[in-house]
Amino acid sequence: MKVIDQFKNKKVLVLGLAKSGESAARLLDKLGAIVTVNDGKPFEDNPAAQSLLEEGIKVITGGHPLELLDEEFALMVKNPGIPYNNPMIEKALAKRIPVLTEVELAYLISEAPIIGITGSNGKTTTTTMIGEVLTAAGQHGLLSGNIGYPASQVAQIASDKDTLVMELSSFQLMGVQEFHPEIAVITNLMPTHIDYHGSFSEYVAAKWNIQNKMTAADFLVLNFNQDLAKDLTSKTEATVVPFSTLEKVDGAYLEDGQLYFRGEVVMAANEIGVPGSHNVENALATIAVAKLRDVDNQTIKETLSAFGGVKHRLQFVDDIKGVKFYNDSKSTNILATQKALSGFDNSKVVLIAGGLDRGNEFDELVPDITGLKKMVILGQSAERVKRAADKAGVAYVEATDIADATRKAYELATQGDVVLLSPANASWDMYANFEVRGDLFIDTVAELKE
């Protein structure tokens, strides 16, 4: 471990639980810190807080009392979902209490090298692809971070023979100071989470934190399909390795249906195990990382050919009487849904869309939804999505929730069609997260098959 005594006997406040906060609290306690956990959920409805209390960790629940910070804390570790304009965080910063996220703790204790993956779309798929390729090559890629496995929890069990393959959100990267991956990937940068960050430039700045401590000995893998990525190359000390589906670059690229790395064919694009142009980009990013880690082409090809995707990201669910169901609940913005649709024939797609309206420009979807067989629209953003459907000339019906939407979509579909849940919106108007929304879609498909 990089630190042994750094936290010993230090008073640390963990703000917000969920998976990452719970993991951070246990790790800090293990490292000898004097831990206090503060979570807004009432104690009686808070199994994580109950469990931590049983382990001897102090917990304060049901709100975030500012007077708690009258104690002399040496450090605050915050849940990444809590914004920096939260009064507790503002007071901590005013008192010059360092505020970190759990990812920083993972870096500080990790004996394993770290590959960090961030971006607006494609993070989970690319992270999973990289992890599977490295593991197939004997390099033990351990998935962690925003992908569902708390980074600090995985870091505790990782050795120097493993590699931490870490999916990182902009929320997590806002709280890093010393974090230093040996390879970082930025899949793409699109306007999203503006309600959290305030502006696109602030969002990009948060993502860009991934490379702050990198040097010329480290590698930064960037998507040269985007001019923004090209512009950012002059602002890093890291060695930039580009990937692109649009041009030949000094890295990974697509040419005549083949995926190359620096002039050498690795595999054919149509051999990738999951559909869609976006997955070609994800595969190219993966190839760049794999080649930087000296993985042979055959291992890369075999792994990516067998790759079955990830849950909630263009996940094939089932086939009922010739109608195929795909769960793309993780598509919480316009670009993700555009890329999902690119893998299908619109005339055979019944699209389920809508959810929490976070200021998306739904007119951008009009060219992509033109020609759809039908749409099923739901959620807070329904009126704006319906206006986009009208402009595209697509007929639609409305639904009250995901179960209702799934049933109506199936009624509208015929043999050979696809029912695609790709909402282009966050889930929080109806559901706790996109996973809950996707699981309800899967459950309803199972009921339809009975």
UniProtKB/Swiss-Prot annotation:
Any single biological process term in GO: cell wall organization
EC number of the protein: 6.3.2.9
Keyword Ribosomal protein attached: no
Subcellular location: Cytoplasm
Pathway note: Cell wall biogenesis; peptidoglycan biosynthesis
Reaction(s) the record says it catalyses: UDP-N-acetyl-alpha-D-muramoyl-L-alanine + D-glutamate + ATP = UDP-N-acetyl-alpha-D-muramoyl-L-alanyl-D-glutamate + ADP + phosphate + H(+)
Keywords tagged on the record: ATP-binding, Cell cycle, Cell division, Cell shape, Cell wall biogenesis/degradation, Cytoplasm, Ligase, Nucleotide-binding, Peptidoglycan synthesis
Primary enzyme class: ligase
Annotated residues for binding of ATP: G119, S120, N121, G122, K123, T124, T125
GO cellular component entries: cytoplasm
GO MF annotation, one: ATP binding
Family note: Belongs to the MurCDEF family.
Record-linked NCBIfam families: murD
HAMAP family, alphabetized: MurD
Function in brief: Cell wall formation. Catalyzes the addition of glutamate to the nucleotide precursor UDP-N-acetylmuramoyl-L-alanine (UMA).
Protein's UniProt name: UDP-N-acetylmuramoylalanine--D-glutamate ligase
